[in-house]
Amino acid sequence: MKPTMMSNWPGFINRFVRQVRHPLDFRRPYRITGFPDNLSPLGYFGQTKQYARAAQEPYLVTVVQGRSKKPCSPRERANRRFGEDSWFVSSTPRAEVLGVADGVGGWRDMGVDAGRFAKELMGCCCGRSEQEDFDGRNPRSLLVSSYQELKDRDDPVVGSSTACVVAMHRRDLTLYTANLGDSGFMVLRNGRVMHRSEEQTHDFNTPFQLTVAPSHKLDSVHCDGPEKAAVSRHPLAPGDLVLLATDGLFDNLPESMLLEMLRKFHGVRDEKELQDAANQVVEKARELSMNASFPSPFAVKARANNISYSGGGKPDDITLILASVEVPKVHR
């Protein structure tokens, strides 16, 4: 953010706090910005995928799908953004790393691209996951170092976002996770939930969030450090499905419906077939988000928190990463 924007800060702060902390702060669309060329998903990622398969190491068959709340340029997938959501997928000889982040929309009222922070955070995590010193067992370290980088830049990246980063370590076939806020992950096996991350929230629809803001205003906004990210580890088995998503999916698609849609895809190796599954899930979530009478998970939570909400889905950006665990026979 340029210094001239900071000079307008006092006039916006009270309105901004209401936007960020209000329980019905629906996130809004974004403007397209470029993604660093050196983080192209077709470069290092594709090369290490080939390495893993040639070396007969465990790997993930991974697909991505998403929908912005409002129509946006078709370039958004290349920019790894769906509205104010962002994502990354990284593959190294040690691990496969996946991440999603959801930018907090309240920043838009201050003239800030609410999705930029999420995009830059995921870009940093992607780059750092491919460095030699990342062993694939501590995804929270990616959040710590990436968050610090955004804060330390000469032109700090101002904003907030949730973050969920997971890594499948090839040698021990274990999923290591770090989750902050209300994005999250699931591990599915034979149509059952083996594990699902828990939401971290201050209040209803006010998730934990990484934030970069002027130091004298930190007390006025929610600012949760990456050390608050919940970490866990989960043994994986061949055919397991690993799912990462932003709240645009979880707030609109009931778990029972999600499980039913994905039940037949256990053990799927074909990328096109898995992509079809992701497409169906995202399209169903988008459809339900526009249904004013559907008892969505968001509407159910609103009533449980005595929040006045007319019911139905929650229009929002939706991002989904869906991966199937593939283990060559030599490792079974």
Curated annotation (Swiss-Prot):
Pfam families given in the database record: PP2C_2
PROSITE patterns in the record: PPM_2 (PS51746)
Location of the PPM-type phosphatase domain: 70-325
InterPro entries (alphabetical): PPM-type-like_dom_sf, PPM-type_phosphatase-like_dom, PPTC7
GO cellular component, one term: mitochondrion
Binding residue positions for Mn(2+) 2: D102, D247
Gene responsible for this protein: fig
Top-rank EC class of the record's enzyme: hydrolase
Name listed for the protein in its UniProt record: Protein phosphatase PTC7 homolog fig
Family note: Belongs to the PP2C family.
The keyword Manganese belongs to this UniProt entry's keyword annotation: yes
GO biological process, one term: dephosphorylation
